[in-house]
Amino acid sequence: MAIHLKASHLGVAVLLLLFGGAIGAAGGGYLLSSGQNHSSPDSPVNTSPQSLTPAPVESNYRSALPLTLPRSAQDDQELNFIARAVQKIGPAVVRIDSERTAVSQGGPMGDQPFFRRFFGEEMPPNPDPREQGTGSGFILSSDGEVLTNAHVVEGASTVKVTLKDGSVLEGKVMGIDTMTDVAVVKVEAENLPVVEIGQSDRLQPGEWAIAIGNPLGLDNTVTVGIISALGRSSSEVGVPDKRVRFIQTDAAINPGNSGGPLLNAKGEVIGVNTAIRADAQGLGFAIPIQTAQNVAENLFTKGKMEHPYLGIHMVTLTPEMTKQLRTSGELPAGVTADTGVLIIQVSPGSPAAQAGLAPGDIILEVGGMGVKTATDVQERVEVSQIGEPLAIAVKRGQKPQMMAVRPGPFPEDLGQ
């Protein structure tokens, strides 16, 4: 991912790149820029004779300072919950450096709408045919199974995993699922520290959220906030092609944090830090760990994650949307409703076409549950079983009908 890069920062960005900053990623690069120099000159010193030769002072005062130093603040009893969580999970958080050959002249992230949506249009061209990037990840098993974001390692020719102790290991990408932005990497090692998995499905807004990762290449950075909201749909976040209900947090998530863990107050992983909104502050998003873990298990065992597929294009009707479709000529004949989920198009030969679904049908129920939005339909389909009948109730004209659709696997040629 990349930060908005403004003209006044270009010089700083180049310096950072030259000194090992992240400069792009397989599928999503990280460009560094900073608006200020954090190194400040020494404070002025008074060099007057008075200050150099102070008069001696006699005193019988006995220092009240203890003769022994107090107990270190690093003592477990002195640590706050944030420090304890970081101490617990920090060793299992890794840095992931990837490199690939550039395939686009449109900048480090090419023309991918996912990254343009989050980080804007001001992405400079990349003259180097190689794209390098830095992200984060965390260790799931002591023998080297690592979870990260798909955009961190997608298309990478080389992947290097750096442990907290500085050890650098060669990583092998075992699988990528772009529909959830989850990927898994394997390193050859033993007795590695591992994270503890929490329950993302039990979260409540207002709970503490702790992010660990390598933002802007600054290893082992910790930021803190709260869970701002739960269940953000991909369309709400701005990436409608992702089959994820995101956790929203105001914990700072920056380029390089991608793939790192989001923790609860106990130091358990509850999410995978994934994205921020460039047009706002304090809007970070993470994939719930239960979603990511399920995908990771499939990627490690099968090398891929199969998502159920119907083969329909649909929209959530509102009075405004109905009017817009009517004006553009895209409203199927006979449709008068201005609420519900309207099928606009059915892909030829798809499971939906084979079951008899047609443009103009308004979806009422999926799997016995009522649906009001296209997101509702997508989520009901996502939890269905490939090849098993899925009951879909529709209204065609003024008549309700029940269809039995057998979802197929999402076609690879659609690029997920």
Curated annotation (Swiss-Prot):
Record-linked InterPro entries: HhoA_HhoB_HtrA-like (IPR048172), PDZ (IPR001478), PDZ_sf (IPR036034), Peptidase_S1_PA (IPR009003), Peptidase_S1C (IPR001940)
Keyword annotations: Hydrolase, Protease, Signal
Region (Disordered): 35-57
Phenotype when the gene is knocked out: No effect in a single knockout, but growth is inhibited at high light (120 umol photons/m(2)/s) or at elevated temperature in a triple protease knockout mutant (hhoA, hhoB and htrA). Triple mutants are not phototactic. No effect on the PSII repair cycle, even in the triple protease knockout strain.
Induction comment from the UniProt entry of this chain: No induction by UV-B light.
Domain PDZ: 320-398
GO BP terms in the entry: proteolysis
Biased composition (Polar residues): 35-53
UniProt-recorded Gene Ontology molecular function terms: serine-type endopeptidase activity
Cleavable signal peptide: 1-25
PANTHER family to which the protein is assigned, alphabetical: SERINE PROTEASE FAMILY S1C HTRA-RELATED, SERINE PROTEASE HTRA2, MITOCHONDRIAL
Family that this chain belongs to: Belongs to the peptidase S1C family.
Physiological role: A putative protease, its function overlaps that of the related putative proteases HtrA and HhoA.
UniProt name for this protein: Putative serine protease HhoB
Originating species: Synechocystis sp. (strain ATCC 27184 / PCC 6803 / Kazusa)
Gene coding for it: hhoB
